[in-house]
């Protein structure tokens, strides 16, 4: 397996809704999920080349990739009440949407985020790493400051773990737990291609980020002090 380290800088806020949470109460995972990272690389390949076949090639190169993240020492999370437009159940020609309210969480990284990607076919996707423009929601903009090949990621880097490892890990130490999604090793490109007409079922599998951190809280904010 070959490893690449990406140094990511988020000039603004990051937001990525916890899987299966309501869009009206959209709490955020404090780090991008493995599926978000992999699908962003696929989308970047298609966007920059205009070639869906190239996106498919990158998909199979990164589908089974090992993803690790080393966050900054602190992560700030703000909770915001926003106005939103929701599609009406019985829309009319003049009124398609209705005004509602929702809660959003936005994550602020005071320093860079280090992302580690390990896979066998890293050379297929490596040229697209530096072209990443967002992770998570489309307004979670970023730019890649540095790309370098490494032997292996540091042990302190966070990895999304499956159910079996999760049960064992939390029995030993206390963690802050965030559910995330990864792409199944059985997933096909047609299932994530919105124009293929194929079923998107069983594309993702649930995993968990276990984060060692102290939490400071206010009424509409919290601060995670990461402990590696």
Curated annotation (Swiss-Prot):
Disulfide linkage: none
Keywords for this protein: Antiviral defense
Keyword Oxidoreductase: no
Matches recorded under InterPro entries: CRISPR-assoc_prot_Cas5_N (IPR013422)
Any single biological process term in GO: defense response to virus
Keyword Iron: no
Functional description taken from the UniProt entry: CRISPR (clustered regularly interspaced short palindromic repeat) is an adaptive immune system that provides protection against mobile genetic elements (viruses, transposable elements and conjugative plasmids). CRISPR clusters contain spacers, sequences complementary to antecedent mobile elements, and target invading nucleic acids. CRISPR clusters are transcribed and processed into CRISPR RNA (crRNA).
Similarity section: Belongs to the CRISPR-associated protein Cas5 family.
UniProt protein name: CRISPR-associated protein Cas5
Gene from which the chain derives: cas5
């Amino acid at each position: 397996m070959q490893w690449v380290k990406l140094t990511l800088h988020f000039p603004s806020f990051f937001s990525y809704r916890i899987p299966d949470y309501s869009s009206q109460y959209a709490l955020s995972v404090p780090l991008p999920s493995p599926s978000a990272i992999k699908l962003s690389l696929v989308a970047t390949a298609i966007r920059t080349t205009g070639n869906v076949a190239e996106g498919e090639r990158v998909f199979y190169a990164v589908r089974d990739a090992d993803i690790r993240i080393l966050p900054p020492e602190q992560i700030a999370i703000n909770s915001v009440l926003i106005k939103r437009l929701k599609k009406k159940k019985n829309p009319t020609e003049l009124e398609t949407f209705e005004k509602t309210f929702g809660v959003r969480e936005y994550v602020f990284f005071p320093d860079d985020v280090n992302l580690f990607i390990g896979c066998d076919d890293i050379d297929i996707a490596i040229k697209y790493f530096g072209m990443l423009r967002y992770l998570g929601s489309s307004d979670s903009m970023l730019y890649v400051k540095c790309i370098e090949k490494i032997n292996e990621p540091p042990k302190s880097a966070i990895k999304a773990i499956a159910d079996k490892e999760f049960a064992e890990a939390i029995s030993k130490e206390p963690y802050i737990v965030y559910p995330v999604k990864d792409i199944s090793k059985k997933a096909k490109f047609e299932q994530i291609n919105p124009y293929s007409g194929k079923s998107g079922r069983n594309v993702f599998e649930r995993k968990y980020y276990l984060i060692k951190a102290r939490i400071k809280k206010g009424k509409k904010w919290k601060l995670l002090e990461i402990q590696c």
